[in-house]
Amino acid sequence: MGLVSNYLYGPNTLSTEEIHNLTIASYNLKLNPILLIGNIHMPKIIDIIKQVEIKEVCVSNQYKIEDIELLNNSTNSKISISINYENFDYNFFEHIKNNVSSFYYDLNIYRKDVIEKKSLMECESQINQLKSFAKPLYLGGGINISNVKEAIKTISPHGIDISTGLKKSNSVDEEKLKKILDNLGFDEIS
């Protein structure tokens, strides 16, 4: 379950206190929460990780190698890097691959007041380069009813983030979820 820090741009962000409370609730429900965070200095991220007691963190791809090493050496959390079309840097990923457990490729580019959307075709080459590192790759941003099957067939990600595609007010749109599962060949929501 992704918990997006309000230090990031985009929808559905949470305060540190909300993340802490949801982290506890997630562990009680045997769920694996992941903190998505960026736009602040690494020491502050480390403090937040320790404060919310989370076991996995996904940081935006804006940090230096030394920052990723500091994060790795200062916490016991698994580290994932969030990547998009605009901030892709293969050489950087080559240098940090031993400090991260997975990659999260976001088809969206989040800015303060706007979200730029990229197509799967535009990003496919970069995604395939990431797959060469033999680390789990998660795909998100713009995955919805119309493209979820193509995304899975084309990319074969370790997992997909369809949260925005399922949003209905402040809850999950079960009708959209059913359509996505039907599109993937599942008969019913369990």
Residue ranges and their predicted role:
Residues 18-23, 68-71, 116, 152, ...:
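C-terminal helical cap(s) of enzyme catalytic domains, especially alpha/beta-barrels
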Residues 4-9, 25-34, 40-147:
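Conserved anion-binding
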Residues 1-21:
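Glycine-rich, proline-tolerant flexible connector loops at the mouths of alpha/beta enzymes
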Residues 1, 33, 56, 80, ...:
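Functionally constrained cores in energy, signaling, and assembly domains
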